[in-house]
Regions:
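Class I SAM-dependent methyltransferase Rossmann-like catalytic core
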Residues: 46-72, 76
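A short SAM/SAH-binding and catalytic strip from SAM-dependent methyltransferases
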Residues: 151-165, 180
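A short acidic, Gly/Pro-enriched loop at the edge of an enzyme's catalytic core
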Residues: 142-153
Length: 272
């Protein structure tokens, strides 16, 4: 198991009954779906994406709309992984990309391990149901339940970037793969919602402690040909919660929507 005890950072052993236990006696039950909850009790309440957002994203991604990004991530992971690689998807959501990466790794005959975590319990439940071969946990990017240098390849796909934790868990020479939206991503969607649609801001690619190996762009036009697909895309974005009702109605009354899809995939190496 790639995960460590979130309380003492000690290694975890999995008992026959599924519990994960450290040498100090801290114990974590495995949920029936197969994941562990490593959010500490003092972080109670609801965290991350709610069930509605998770279901919308799952429905949208299952159409294959973001498959070019998924294939790029899989190819990049395979390029740098070995049989001994410990691969971690930080902020993996409902596990769409994590699942495809694990399947590609398996098809290649590799013994590399693929794990993921997300702060949303609803999201991790669906990820665990989708692929029982994944090691999954509820956890925060700002307090990863992983030992120092315990990750060979770390992915961050539209997740919060906690740079100190990223550097802590990534071994020297390890790879960090990060996907972000480019400037025109979903501009067609925003053009329907807002009178003055805005472009995304892309920050400087330089990150402390990491050497940039590659910067690859993915760009295409996506046509959504049903109200259900348009609704799924909208509901999985933050725009669903900060858009006036009249604009929502205007978007959701459309039968067809064309929008720009733009991503940037950065690959970094942890400096020694």
């Amino acid at each position: 198991m790639i995960f460590c005890c979130p309380k003492c950072k000690g290694s975890l052993s999995v008992l026959p009954d599924g519990r994960a236990v450290c040498k100090d006696g801290h114990s974590y039950d495995r949920a029936k779906e197969g994941y562990y909850n490593f959010l500490l009790k003092n972080t109670g309440g609801t965290h991350g994406d709610n069930k509605e957002m998770v279901l919308a994203r799952r429905a949208f991604l299952e159409t294959g709309a973001y498959l070019p990004l998924a294939e790029k991530l899989c190819d990049t992971v395979l390029r740098y992984s070995t049989d001994a690689s410990r691969i971690l998807d930080g902020g993996c959501g409902e596990g769409y990309y994590t699942d495809l990466i694990e399947r590609r790794i398996s098809e290649a005959g590799s013994c590399a391990s693929v794990s993921g975590f997300d702060i949303s319990r609803d999201a991790i439940k669906y990820a665990a149901k989708k692929n029982r071969s994944l090691s999954l946990a509820v956890a925060s990017s700002y307090d990863m339940p992983v030992g120092d240098g315990g990750v060979d390849i770390l992915l961050n796909v539209f997740a919060p970037l906690a740079i100190e934790e990223t550097l802590r868990v990534l071994r020297q020479g390890g790879k960090f793969i990060m996907a972000i939206p480019d400037v025109n991503h979903l501009f067609g969607l925003k053009s329907v919602l807002y009178e003055r649609p805005y472009k995304n801001t892309v920050e400087d690619s330089a990150l402390p402690g990491l050497k940039l190996l590659s910067e690859e762009k993915i760009s295409y036009t996506l046509t959504l040909d049903s109200r259900e697909k348009i609704s799924s895309l909208f509901m999985m974005t933050p725009y669903a919660y900060r858009t006036p009702e009249s604009a929502k109605e205007r978007l959701l009354s459309l039968d067809v929507l064309k929008t720009e899809i733009e991503f940037i995939v950065f690959t970094y190496e942890r400096e020694k």
